Amino acid sequence: MSRRAKMISKIKELMYQPEYIRNIGIVAHIDHGKTTLSDNLLAGAGMISAELAGDQRFLDFDEQEQARGITIDAANVSMVHSYEGNEYLINLIDTPGHVDFGGDVTRAMRAVDGAVVVVCAVEGIMPQTETVLRQALKENVRPVLFINKVDRLINELKLDASELQERFVKIIANANKLIKNMAPEEFRDKWQVRVEDGSVAFGSAYHNWAINVPIMQETGINFNDIYKYCTEDNQKELAQKVPLHQVLLGMVVEHLPSPAESQAYRVPIIWSGDLESEEGQAMLKTDPEGPLAVMVTDVSIDKHAGEVATGRVYGGAIEKGSEVFLVGSHSKARVQQVGVYMGPERVNTDKVPAGNIVAITGAKNAVAGETICDTGRKIKAFEGLEHISEPVVTVAVEAKNTKDLPKLIEVLRQVGKEDPTVRVEINEETGEHLISGMGELHLEIIAYRINEKGVEIETSEPIVVYRETVAGTAGPVEGKSPNKHNRFYIEIEPVEASVMQAIQEGKIKEGRVKGKEMAKNFIEAGMDKEEARRVWDVYEKNLFINMTRGIQYLDEIKELLMDGFESAMDNGPVAKEKVMGVKIKLMDAKIHEDAVHRGPAQVLPAIRKGIFGAMMSAEPVLLEPIQKVFINVPQDYMGSATREIQNRRGQIVNMTQEGDMVTVESTVPVAEMFGFAGDIRSATEGRCLWSTENAGFERLPNELQHTITREVRTRKGLSPEPYRADHYLG
């Protein structure tokens, strides 16, 4: 029996023993060494040859990833590790650290129970480390810490043993501070990472060695020895004595929970159904015999198998050939194959039980975030996947050859499925198709993928996505239907800052409000009690509130009014950009008694005109997307770096110094960030590290409001000036 065949049969056996399974993610800031670490873990588990590990980038099996040397998608792999006489199945997901691909991290965190947080010893905890750790803790995923690139502290920064320990203490304290602030209350102390219990390891992923306290006690190797091995350039011997995979996978087995343990406290957070029901109990107990519950975290397109959905089985078992129900798309599908991952390969089996990460082919219509269950037992969907930032940059895409148009549309739909953080707008009338993403790099990669699928495209210069809102209040104004028989009286004001924050943090859910149970959340967020009880719809951070009393026929057109409100919020009156942070209050209404005269053709234009008229009367303004920019630069170049920021309408928020390095923290409008990579590199002669994080939207400065409005409108083929309020209210 070949080694590979042995591995496969072992994986198939361990799948049924949840207490011997560990589902883990590796998360870090870009270039802190995640993929190198994953490769060496695989080599240790006998999945790829040891010589190639680190250069092979086994999990970066996309051409673009290998060319750019960064991870773009989250890749999956399963392996077997022996620890203290038992064998464990470890399902590993390598996630991207670049801010443009944060959506993949969010989705991977839903599939795992534990995370190895990799921090570069030289750079310490960076902004993206905080973001990914925050995402992990929000999903109740337990962390352990691996401090990587320790050899560089010794050989490049020439730190001695006591300075090394000082540096480590600082990194660990920072990590624990984040865990204390973000972990669920009952785990704040339990999940602290500690050197003494072995939940912190130190090492070099590139040179394939690691140590933690239990291994030091076992092997007798201490920090002074490490110091010696590194300065004498003898890390190969070190890697034989304390191989990376043994230390890290041992730490994973020892400190990170099995599905059997974690589902008991994770399910209540990610599934809001009845925990006492049969489905609820099956998930809490990781029961392979219970009703089926799978959460899809990712969809990719395979040349041979078509769409492959990756997900986590929380309850029951998913079987080849069975018919399943997709809760989100309300459709049935027949499962063609199920299996687990070994690197980029899928190994098919007959069924995959609760507690495992599964690859499913045949689940047509599945998208990331979909819930799959048995056809006979429809369950409540899992909570939506909330990604921390939203798309801020758009490019227009056209096919080079007109004959490719139909194919382009199909490929764009696929891209939207594969990566839910991309927003795709297909306009078959004008032939202009828009893709919005998290940043320049994100969109470059997507354009490359479209070309790879056989459609040659041309893309426009990147365009920034703006938002519309109001700075003042107005109303009541009257919106009339075309037949003049229906009238709606509307008031408008900005949404309270505290309510905006509650929506952003997910304390207030988006969607049409059913019943009164949401009122409590609105009141807690600081909203007026009367208004809180009357919210009908929360849409894209806007509120629609019915303040009327006893209006006849209002209930019969309630859904139409919300449709009209939502379509108005999708294309605002200033520049046909999305609206955010606006509170629309319906104060009064006159509605025709005859249903024929109050259909969609009458109600929709009336409510839209009323909303647009109110917005144009309430000091409408554009908001622009902002990014936080972190630059780590030698002191001599600090002046050049800050000048780069200030020339881009940026603001310096904070500066900290460590040794001769300075970290500059600033905020810069996304519109000014194009071409920043090249400019900052030349300004600092390549001696800087920088990263960005999306920081929401802020009001565009007054002197730019008019120019940008005209630019956006002209680009969209509209008249340069927006209509005034009386155009809508006349």
Curated annotation (Swiss-Prot):
Q: Known InterPro entries for this protein?
A: EFG_II, EFG_III/V, EFG_V-like, EFTu-like_2, G_TR_CS, P-loop_NTPase, Ribosomal_Su5_D2-typ_SF, Ribsml_uS5_D2-typ_fold_subgr
Signal peptide (residue range): none
This chain's protein is named Elongation factor 2
Q: Which Gene3D superfamilies does the entry link to?
A: 3.30.230.10, 3.30.70.240, Elongation Factor G (Translational Gtpase), domain 3 (3.30.70.870), P-loop containing nucleotide triphosphate hydrolases (3.40.50.300), Translation factors (2.40.30.10)
Cite the SMART domains for this sequence.
EFG_C (SM00838), EFG_IV (SM00889)
State one Pfam family annotation.
Answer: EFG_C
Indicate the segments forming the tr-type G domain, all copies: 19-260
GO CC annotations, alphabetized: cytosol; ribonucleoprotein complex
Which molecular-function annotation in GO is an example for this chain?
GTP binding
* UniProt function note: Catalyzes the GTP-dependent ribosomal translocation step during translation elongation. During this step, the ribosome changes from the pre-translocational (PRE) to the post-translocational (POST) state as the newly formed A-site-bound peptidyl-tRNA and P-site-bound deacylated tRNA move to the P and E sites, respectively. Catalyzes the coordinated movement of the two tRNA molecules, the mRNA and conformational changes in the ribosome.
Name its cellular compartments.
Cytoplasm
Q: What is its main location?
A: cytoplasm
Q: Which family does it belong to?
A: Belongs to the TRAFAC class translation factor GTPase superfamily. Classic translation factor GTPase family. EF-G/EF-2 subfamily.
**Which PANTHER family does this UniProt record tie to the protein?**
ELONGATION FACTOR-LIKE GTPASE 1, TRANSLATION ELONGATION FACTOR-RELATED
Annotated positions of the Diphthamide modification: 597
Organism superkingdom: Archaea
Binding-site positions, GTP: 28-35, 94-98, 148-151
Keywords (A to Z) from UniProt:
Cytoplasm, Elongation factor, GTP-binding, Nucleotide-binding, Protein biosynthesis
